[in-house]
UniProtKB/Swiss-Prot annotation:
Native source organism of the sequence: Xenopus laevis (African clawed frog)
KTS motif, short sequence motif: residues: 373-375
Positions of the UniProt region annotated as Important for interaction with target DNA: 332-346, 358-366
Residues of the site described as Important for interaction with target DNA: K389, E395
Localization per Swiss-Prot or TrEMBL: Nucleus; Cytoplasm; Nucleus speckle
Name of the protein: Wilms tumor protein homolog A
Family: Belongs to the EGR C2H2-type zinc-finger protein family.
Zinc fingers classed as C2H2-type: ranges: 288-312, 318-342, 348-370, 379-403
Amino acid sequence: MGSDVRDMNLLPPVSSLSGNSSCNMPVSSSAQWAPVLDFPPGAPYSSLTPHSFIKQEPTWNPDPHEDQCLSAFTVHFSGQFTGTAGACRYGPFGAPTPSQATTGQARMFSNAPYLSNCLDNQQGMRNQGYSAVAFDGTPSYGHTPSHHTSQFTNHSFKHEDPLSQQTSLGEQQYSVPPPVYGCHTPTDTCTGSQALLLRTPYNSDNLYPMTSQLDCMTWNQMNLGSSLKSHGTSYENDSHSSPMLYNCGGQYRIHTHGVFRGIQDVRRVPGVTPAIVRSTEANEKRPFMCAYPGCNKRYFKLSHLQMHSRKHTGEKPYQCDFKDCERRFSRSDQLKRHQRRHTGIKPFQCKTCQRKFSRSDHLKTHTRTHTGKTSEKPFSCRWPSCQKKFARSDELVRHHNMHQRNMTKLQLAL
């Protein structure tokens, strides 16, 4: 399985912000560990451990954008946050009290539209080292996103290269999708036994996130889906809340290991294979589903899905080593069957007529001609008043052609 490894070092915070002076964000010189997200009220979370995990999986809800491709990968990050005070909070939880502004914990992801009373514009904020990267998206808690509409679609965010943070060469501008909606509360955070879930659909035209969501969930490898759903139920009936991500005066590091979906995606990034999507509990018998657009095939094993994904990517790693034969195959068993053409080996023999075959499915089809059982002739003629059955599909095709020729002759005679 291929991987996409990104190493993002955000710009260090500065001691002052442009804009409204009411935004008070003192920054300490010593690095401190702080929670990454805000979470819903009443969540029994303590502090987030320095080393935490974000497991990215596709949303369980129907994707309204059919042209987007799902991705599934794990993000491991460790963060050092230097901001000692909470940022200006606006939205469903209201503005912070003076005590919260001085004793609150550092927050993650500043964004000018969310903090319009604190910052004059997003560009000024970006130049000062804030909002170096932001993942934005629409809510997905089992309800339609009609309550949360996109308000800022023309902004952009950047990825700062640690080697050239002070130059324009380290800056890549990407289009920012609608605002992020996550779980937040001014005081509660996640514990080390829990995890943060990041769900991001990817568009096949580019490899950068179009929408994403950060959620808190109990870390349970056996049942991740139900934990997430139970966590988001408190928001299903809240039609007026519009939770926002908050400002963080900090520096952190993200390491991602993942896979992407889509033909265009895979061809643009060498060594990257399509995404692997775990299904919900309703499909536990075939838990591995292909996430390629328009393909919903499911498999018992992960290896089977990986082999299937090569049909979409066009990857053929197995090559015939016989002289003057350069044919390539996506699966090892296909190569093995092909090589029997060169060697002449036919390991499968009919016990009735002793005829040999190079493939087991060919032998199975052949044995139906001996038994004559209706149950072993699955191909039925659908021509009116014809009830013949055949053991092989090619026999049925020839039979249909016979009907067609007879009909043509009859029409010409009339």
